[in-house]
Amino acid sequence: MAAAVTVEEVRRAQRAEGPATVLAIGTATPANCVYQADYPDYYFRITKSEHMVELKEKFKRMCDKSQIRKRYMHLTEEILQENPNMCAYMAPSLDARQDIVVVEVPKLGKAAAQKAIKEWGQPRSRITHLVFCTTSGVDMPGADYQLAKMLGLRPNVNRLMMYQQGCFAGGTVLRVAKDLAENNRGARVLAVCSEITAVTFRGPSESHLDSMVGQALFGDGAAAVIVGSDPDEAVERPLFQMVSASQTILPDSEGAIDGHLREVGLTFHLLKDVPGLISKNIERALGDAFTPLGISDWNSIFWVAHPGGPAILDQVEAKVGLDKERMRATRHVLSEYGNMSSACVLFILDEMRKRSAEDGHATTGEGMDWGVLFGFGPGLTVETVVLHSVPITAGAAA
């Protein structure tokens, strides 16, 4: 009788050989585009707050300093007129918000996922795992289930739903997708972040200026990636390899960013020194990730940093002595889309690989080999993903 297979042999056969690789990226936004220059007038009019003249001036200054040119929002004037409680500062409105997001979050995620699947070019039946992340509402079965049904994925696709993580979670999604791809030979993971500000939109208040910071920064968007190890390069085109991924809670940062789901929707609280807390700890995060690789020149790597706001980017740049062009892709996404929470870093990855090809760089990482992706959010939590670019071949810009 043949000897039984050992557990070690089973594990070896289950694991992939190479690192997890980003094989495709897709992004989507609602059709409704909001220009930042016009937003203070619109916001105070739609929330019936035009009598708050001084507060409006403060909000205008927030918008002017945001370095955001435009954002996309599912909430149109018509929707807000139909839901006046969402326009008040603190009126019960969770049901109305939930009714919107449980439909629109999976729908926007589907639009991004379809683009990623089209670029990947393989049958949907090859998708083995689905990771879905949103901070916009909660439902059961979740947005992961809804998306799997909408896309016609196999009923035995392995799903993971992440609710209420916040702005660091684009990094979390990649970390989880990496582990799934590397520990399941042949796995192809569809990872989706979909965020809609219908949960956080509310009128202004003199007593809650940090809520107004959110009103000045947040936008809607969804992004999707296909992740897998050992790509079949006859039919799959790698974009970035994920070399390591880690998460940490910053010291002395409790309460710096909070979100609470209440009858009034998702309330947002922000301490003033979030940029300082992040910049103070950024060198340690970089050192932990790159010292094993013998890298200590932070201008020699490409950067994908969650653009929580311009002050975070400014202080990180100053702390580690970054050249301005290192954050070019990051600042472009902040300018053109605002802070889309978890989806931002995937938008930036997409922008980076496209711009690298258009500008004639040798690699998907602006001509550099190694790069870092940072997620920053409630906790304060920092996600750090070490990336390796791939060479750009002829036609890769298409």
Swiss-Prot record:
Binding residue positions for CoA: 58-65, 311
Assigned EC number: 2.3.1.74
Keyword Ubl conjugation tagged: no
Pathway field: Secondary metabolite biosynthesis; flavonoid biosynthesis
Residues at the catalytic site: 167 (acyl-thioester intermediate)
Pfam families (alphabetical): Chal_sti_synt_C, Chal_sti_synt_N
Catalyses which reaction(s): (E)-4-coumaroyl-CoA + 3 malonyl-CoA + 3 H(+) = 2',4,4',6'-tetrahydroxychalcone + 3 CO2 + 4 CoA
GO BP: flavonoid biosynthetic process; polyketide biosynthetic process
The keyword Lipoprotein is assigned to this record: no
Keyword annotations: Acyltransferase, Flavonoid biosynthesis, Transferase
Molecular functions per Gene Ontology: acyltransferase activity, transferring groups other than amino-acyl groups; naringenin-chalcone synthase activity
Protein residues bound to substrate: 200, 219-220
InterPro entries reported in the protein's UniProt record: Chalcone/stilbene_synt_C, Chalcone/stilbene_synt_N, Chalcone/stilbene_synthase_AS, Polyketide_synthase_type-III, Thiolase-like
Function, as annotated: The primary product of this enzyme is 4,2',4',6'-tetrahydroxychalcone (also termed naringenin-chalcone or chalcone) which can under specific conditions spontaneously isomerize into naringenin.
Record's subunit section: Homodimer.
Family note: Belongs to the thiolase-like superfamily. Chalcone/stilbene synthases family.
Entry protein name: Chalcone synthase 1
Organism: Oryza sativa subsp. japonica
